[in-house]
Amino acid sequence: MAEVTLQNISKVYDDVDKKRGRKKAIEDISFTVHDKEFMVIVGPSGCGKSTLLRMIAGLEDISEGTLAIDGKIINDLSPRDRDIAMVFQNYALYPHMTVYDNMAFGLKLKKFSRSEIKERVMQTAKLLEIEDELYRKPKTLSGGQRQRVAIGRAIIRRPKVFLFDEPLSNLDAKLRSQMRIELQKLHREINATMIYVTHDQTEAMTLGNRIAVLNKGQLMQLDTPLQLYKHPDNRFVAGFIGSPTMNFIKGILKKNGGNFFLEVSTDYTIPVGSEIPAPFENKIGKELEIGIRPENIIISDQKDISTDESLLEVMAYENMGNEQLVYLSLKSQTLIARRSAQDSVEIGLKFFVRFPADKLIFINPENGEVFHKR
């Protein structure tokens, strides 16, 4: 298969608003997708992820930087000469053709023999479990079946690189979950280099060997799913990765004896430990923001006398079946905590709440950079 290398890639558009001038949709992005890797590019709508994928495919010009496959620069190659197959959100199947003919179409254009076309179609159909649908038209298929056909049409070409542009967005939740499993299986079986774009962080976390997180055209962080979740580099990644989102709490950093704490208000403080990241040790009296995942907030109806805990009121809760999401009021903020479904929760109840210091992240309010406990 192939290794894909992006070096200082940028995409610049001439903005229609003359006062704003040129607009950078992608700004100086560099990373390498390793041979046989499943790389996911994730970010909110408008972050530039689909633009970046289209640049890799050759559907958008590269304004600055170089794009290479296996060390060969392909900036000026047409899409058809890049040996790349792309699967879109809208399937793009020919409605008047059968599944067989849709899958075989590209091979027919390349003058493959009838026997080789049949062999490849049958192999691919078996892999995707659509043998029984080969002689049906797309309009008679379910959304999941149509997406399998679109993927099959890409696989049958045996390209160096597969590109997926939000291919599951049109499917319902149950089908999306099923297709995620099938894509994982497909990647293992064909052992191909895949680049997958989505706005859905669940897809990103379950599919990617590594994930590139984009925001406003910039690469915010590239790492494994677990590293992104546990060790985000910045506030954006900390808040974007994870559902429910991370809790963020602002306050003034104080010190009492050998212990640091965050003063959220004159009558509410949060202990943050006897040690904090070095950049904040001389920031006593300055604004600080901390973050903590919902599963790391400890709530109880009984106070632990060995720890510093404060009472917070339940504003709302969601019963998810296996757990509850409890929404707690902290001054003008709402915090989310996970709690066992077996524990009773009612709106208006007050719980003792503890924020374990070793589970906190520390955020520089000036640039959003995240620091972790030493």
Model features per residue range: what roles?
Residues 5, 32, 68, 352-354:
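ABC ATPase nucleotide-binding domain
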Residues 29-40:
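Pre-Walker A (P-loop) beta-loop-beta motif of ABC nucleotide-binding domains
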Residues 42-44:
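The feature captures the beta-strand-to-loop junction immediately N-terminal to the Walker
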Residues 57:
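Helix-to-loop junction immediately C-terminal to a conserved catalytic motif
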Residues 65-73:
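Conserved ABC transporter NBD signature motif
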Residues 82-236, 240:
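ABC ATPase nucleotide-binding domains
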Residues 255-374:
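Non-catalytic connector elements of ABC transporters
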